Amino acid sequence: MKYSLKTVMSLVDHSGLKPYLREDEIARLIGEASEMGNYSVCIEPIYGNFAVEYIKEKGYSLKVDVTLDFPFGSLPTSARKKIIEDSVYADEIDMVIPIGYVKSHRWDKVEQDINDVVSTARDLGLVSKIITEDGYLTLDEKLKTYDIVIRSAPDFIKTSTGFADKEFCKSLGNETGATPENVKLMSEIAKKIGSNIGIKAAGGIHTYDQVEKIIDSAGMIPEPSNIRLGMSGTKKLYEEMKKASVQQS
């Protein structure tokens, strides 16, 4: 199915997550997101309050999305809950699963942690997205992790951070970043459970062809409450789609 420039851009969390980004670069990111009609800016929490104030000052209609325990998912649950509580200025949070527990198959601890962080976010009125970091998981681990995350009822399940170790992913026969196959698997498990959870695809999304396949794989109406696209290369895609639109008219 073909999707319009406006539709695609409305699904994007325009991301600036490199640790060396300066405040002026975050300001530029926010300006780009507003100009392109994106849903939110996805940034590190160090710039969270700045982003909220800058968006308010400029009068932009953008949400602020911050990444927490990112990209490693290595903090204890108590610390993860605390950083959620410290993020009440934001609209949304993207938090990584406790990867070590998943790889250790400590499913009891994974379930307890995810339930705790999701309920903490919900109590504070924050939209929550749980990042599964698909490239680090075997198929069996994906099936179990997706099931646990979806049953914990965050607003979204998210594919990846975009910062996964490529060599480790390769050792498991996995790609890094978002793939239509993993998005489809998430959607199928959600339907089996009876969940209307949203899906966020992130990591390595650069072209319209990728976007179209991902949205089709999700099998949902392409609205921001159902599907998100985490992208740092949004501007390139915007220009690509804009040019194609002009050529077709």
From Swiss-Prot:
InterPro entries: Aldolase_TIM, DeoC, DeoC/FbaB/LacD_aldolase, DeoC_typeI
Main location: cytoplasm
A molecular function (GO) term: deoxyribose-phosphate aldolase activity
Transmembrane segments: none
Catalytic reaction list: 2-deoxy-D-ribose 5-phosphate = D-glyceraldehyde 3-phosphate + acetaldehyde
Name of the protein described by the UniProt record: Deoxyribose-phosphate aldolase
Gene name as annotated: deoC
Pathway involvement of the protein, from the record: Carbohydrate degradation; 2-deoxy-D-ribose 1-phosphate degradation; D-glyceraldehyde 3-phosphate and acetaldehyde from 2-deoxy-alpha-D-ribose 1-phosphate: step 2/2
Positions of the catalytic residues: D94 (proton donor/acceptor), K158 (schiff-base intermediate with acetaldehyde), K200 (proton donor/acceptor)
One Gene Ontology cellular component annotation held by this UniProt entry: cytoplasm
